[in-house]
């Protein structure tokens, strides 16, 4: 594990100089999605937690690309997207806590799952997270009440910060409903918080993530 100051420096340098896929540049135009909070229900609801320092509530590195890819796969009229915002501010320091995020952020994700369950009872829920957002989802999903957890059909985790600690899965959630995507060279997946350029490439894997999530929802 590295010091917070070094992590800040790494993220700043990589954000400024690291290669960014074209799809990620397009997604920067819109980094938020709040369908649930706007009262919109569709057959499939994607709830996503962005990575540290990303703006909006979805982020451009993995969140919005996954939302867009899932809409392309299933149809825009079939998919609602909701980012985890509010108390989850995607700050850097919570990465260094025992759960790699803080309880307020986990609770905010749980709030979104509860909203989807109560507001859209017939919807099939899928979820995702990137970087610190994977820890947010990990902490939330493993503690969901069974009646809500059973409606979460699939989860994708990009650059899973608890990949080593949790053995590549979310505790108390079916492993076959979870896809961990780790880019070659992403040391975060090896149990460190060392940020390499590979950690910024996950827009490239949005199609793969969407394929997995689509395979977990019924037609």
From Swiss-Prot:
Entry EC number(s): 3.1.1.74
Superkingdom, taxonomy of origin: Eukaryota
Keyword Ribosomal protein applies: no
Active-site residues annotated for this sequence: 131, 186, 199
PROSITE patterns assigned: CUTINASE_1, CUTINASE_2
Catalytic activity: cutin + H2O = cutin monomers
Signal sequence annotation: 1-17
Subcellular location per the Swiss-Prot or TrEMBL entry: Secreted
GO molecular function: cutinase activity
Function: Catalyzes the hydrolysis of complex carboxylic polyesters found in the cell wall of plants. Degrades cutin, a macromolecule that forms the structure of the plant cuticle.
Homology family: Belongs to the cutinase family.
PANTHER family: CUTINASE 1-RELATED (PTHR48250:SF3), CUTINASE 2-RELATED (PTHR48250)
Stated name of the protein: Probable cutinase 4
Organism taxonomic ancestry: Eukaryota, Fungi, Dikarya, Ascomycota, Pezizomycotina
